[in-house]
Amino acid sequence: MIHTLAINKHNEIRTNLPIEEILEGDFQWSWNDFDQPIDDEIEKLHHPFRFHPLSIEDCLHNLQRPKIDYFETYTFFVTHCLNPKTIKKDELNIFLGKNFIVTFHHHASIEVNAVKEMLTREDVATWTQYTVLYQLLDHLVDNYFPIVYDIEDSLAEIDENPTKKTMEALLDELFSTRHQLLSLRHTVVPMKDIVHQMINSEKIAALLTKKEYYSDIYDHLLKISELVESNRELTTDIRDSYLSYNSHHSNRIMQILTVITTIFMPLSFLAGLYGMNFVNMPELQWKYGYFLLLFIMASIGIGMFILFKRKGWFK
């Protein structure tokens, strides 16, 4: 579906006009939103807009790397949106021209809907297509923050483990969180490069007077990027701590088993020695031989147990 919004000379909003009528009419600027378009609607990118085939191809191939392409009559942006609840990545393509902005997305966009709502309730005279671009990027980046904060909370819970989950369950959660951070990093870093390029480029003349606004977005992206990196390091630290604890726990178990085996070695030797079928073994003929052997074996076992306990091998 294509949603159109055009601002006439009297700063009045006209909605859902045909694109051809908007482009041929006397409007200050327009916003044309391609919301999950069908094939016939996609054709309008070719005509009447006449966008470059490479830009249209990028729109149709979802989840391209975020970037900016400069053309003679427009600038093309590929940006990534993240759903704060599901962390699902989606692509928002933006065409920015002299008197128009076109947005293209394959799924419903909460950023686009939020900016549309802002535009309809604020003073339209203060808005241009460049304002729409800024608001889209600002909303898009702001939606990254809840994701980072949720991940931080998850890491804190994994670290404290209040529900006493098993080591295997904790490591599964930790690796899942690390994967989320990696996905977030693959989104934030290219977006940061895009905004930095916008701030330092002179190819979009109208943005030169709005650098402080885009610098604010860039600062937000820097903060998010730093949070992502610090949380990735934290996942590594937590993982190493768990693995170290698990290794230490395994070593303690092996130590106890080794001590038990060591205690039983002389006992097994005595049992094996007197279990041999030799006729000439005088001790076997003595009526107290059996009890003496039991006493010796018990003394050896108790003595070795006391020795190892004093050395702290059973702690």
Where are the regions that the model predicts?
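Peripheral, non-transmembrane regulatory/ligand-interaction domains of membrane transport proteins
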Residues: 1-207, 213-216, 220-223, 227, ...
